[in-house]
A protein has these predicted regions:
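Alpha/beta-hydrolase fold catalytic core
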Residues: 260-326
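Glycine/threonine-rich phosphate-binding loop and adjacent beta-strand/alpha-helix elements that clamp
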Residues: 333-407
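Rossmann-like dinucleotide-binding core of oxidoreductases
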Residues: 6, 10-12, 16-37, 130-260, ...
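Feature captures the FAD/FMN-dependent oxidoreductase FAD-binding
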Residues: 71-136, 311
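C-terminal active-site-capping segments
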Residues: 394-397, 401-482
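Core beta-strand elements of the Rossmann-like FAD/NAD(P) dinucleotide-binding domain
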Residues: 3, 118-127, 166, 320-329
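Beta1-alpha1 glycine-rich phosphate/pyrophosphate-binding loop at the start
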Residues: 3-7, 12-93, 197-198, 265-269
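Short beta-strand to alpha-helix junction loop
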Residues: 66-85, 246-254, 280-292
């Protein structure tokens, strides 16, 4: 049987797409999930201290608000449980093909169908929604000798809780978002922790990360509109912050001054303080939030190593100054394949086009959601739809305001739909024109940029503008073949 829609992934994006498709009267669709459980990022990232840095009321689906959050900024287990609850409430589990890893997605022009090859067999679909997300594939560091390490190795996104860290010498590579949350949790139990830092991060204190009071939960449950009001107040606060990222970069100096005061208060050692001081504009790389990272870094069993890594040997990490730092456990907090996401390499469209090329700056896209050489294929979390200041869930729902009507039209008219190349080029050029005047155009090296230095990741404007631009399916912007 040919599916109307094949959805790749069952995290926030896949679940939201399923609910929106069903609400639009579209049936005969399925989610393909390579794991044995739903949840995506929040299923996979189980490292100690893992939490969201967007408020719980905002980092949730608009049609599935949760009045029972226990913390204003939730930890991983509660977010994963929220996704499980969403699937249960909307009866989505039966739509998920668990343990189905997609190996290839190729368009059959003669049949006007997408052919999906999985480890459990082959499928066909009239439409495809890629909802695997940008944080799906863990990136191990490209360091000589990593495979020769005699101890135990793991990535924060593939945490192995069976590894006992008590009394161990631990090497942590990376000081990004995962590391900043995880390091304070392992320092008290490790005998020694070496933290390898390439670039210092801007870190702000977590001003509002606190347990939700009982009376607040009762208000959310029984006072109509109360939680909705809090959600939107948080949204607009973040949009004001976004102005500094996108239009008023000089205002970031206030945040940089505040971050410096926080760092100076926590780190009294001038040498360590200097090592932890960023040399780029705040926001060019992801801004981190933590009350516990700096206190962890001043503990007597912690060393911050900024000397470059030469190679990894059986007994530890050798830096470029020739010193061998012995370790029992190697933890890689080295992020994900974002601008070169492997899922893009699996998708083959017209004229032998490969979707991954869009992230290399070689292919235009439309609304970060569709591509001219990939008919009836759509992508959540596509080019320039990630954020540096607000909730990605808002962006997913905005994209679906375009994607679902487009799919509904294609099914109703039995049509093949793809954005006109001229419209895709127009959209992509507009994004590129915006970026140089934003904080992401100030010259730092980050995972927001592709190999060519182009911002292919972050939306360089206010999110409410994106919501307006994605409102509905504009037939005049598309090539339509019946």
């Amino acid at each position: 049987m040919t599916l109307n829609v094949a959805i790749i992934g069952s995290g926030f994006g896949g679940l939201a797409a399923s609910v929106k498709l069903r609400n639009a009267g579209i049936d005969n669709f399925a989610m393909f999930e390579r794991a044995d459980e739903l949840g995506g990022t929040w299923r996979d990232n189980t490292y100690p201290g893992c939490r969201c840095d967007v408020a719980s009321n905002l980092y949730s689906l608009s049609f599935a608000r949760n009045p029972n959050w226990s913390n204003s900024f939730s930890y991983q287990p509660e977010i994963q449980q929220y996704l499980l609850d969403v699937a249960k409430k909307f009866k989505l589990r039966d739509l998920i093909k668990f343990n189905h890893e997609v190996l290839d997605i190729t368009y059959d022009q003669s049949k006007k169908l997408w052919k999906l090859k999985t480890n459990q067999g082959d499928f066909e679909a009239k439409n495809v929604i890629l909802a695997a997300g940008g944080l799906a594939e863990a990136r191990l560091p490209n360091i000589d000798g990593i495979e020769s390490f005699a101890g135990q190795t793991m990535h924060t996104a593939r945490w192995d809780s069976s590894i006992d860290l008590k009394g161990k010498r631990i090497a942590v590579i990376g000081t990004g978002a995962s590391a900043v949350q995880m390091i304070p949790e392992i320092v008290p139990i490790a005998s020694h922790v070496d933290v390898y830092q390439r670039t210092a991060s801007w870190i702000l204190p977590h001003m509002k990360g606190h347990p939700v009071k009982k009376w607040t939960t009762l208000v959310y449950r029984f006072v109509p509109g109360a939680q909705w009001s809090v959600r939107w107040a948080g949204y607009w606060r973040r949009e004001l912050l976004g102005l500094a990222f996108t239009k008023k970069i000089e205002r970031l100096q206030v945040g940089m001054d505040g971050a410096k005061q926080f760092r100076d208060l926590m780190i009294k050692d001038p040498v360590l303080n200097a090592k932890l001081t960023p040399d780029y504009t705040m926001g060019c790389k992801r801004v981190l939030i933590s009350n516990y990272f700096y206190p962890a870094m001043v503990q007597p069993n912690v060393d911050l190593i900024t000397e470059g890594i030469d190679r990894i040997e059986a007994n530890g990490v050798r830096t470029k100054d020739g010193v061998l730092h012995e370790a029992d456990v190697l933890i890689c907090a080295t992020g994900f394949y974002v601008t070169d996401s492997p899922v893009g390499k699996l998708v083959h469209g017209l004229d032998d086009a490969i979707l991954a090329d869009s992230y290399l700056g070689d292919m235009a896209n439309y609304l970060g959601s569709s591509f001219s050489k990939f008919p009836n294929l759509f992508m959540l979390g596509g080019p320039n739809t990630s954020l540096g200041h607000n909730s990605i869930v808002f962006m997913h729902e905005s994209q679906l305001n375009y994607i679902v009507p487009a799919i509904k039209y294609s099914l109703k008219k039995k049509a093949v739909v793809s954005p006109k190349e001229s419209k895709a080029i127009e959209w992509t050029n507009a994004i590129r024109a915006k970026t140089p005047s934003t904080v992401w155009g100030t010259g730092c090296k980050s995972w927001y940029l592709n190999a060519s230095g182009e911002n292919t990741t972050v939306w360089p404007d206010q999110t409410f503008k994106f919501r307006t631009l994605t409102r509905g399916f504009k037939k005049q912007d598309h090539d339509i073949t019946v």
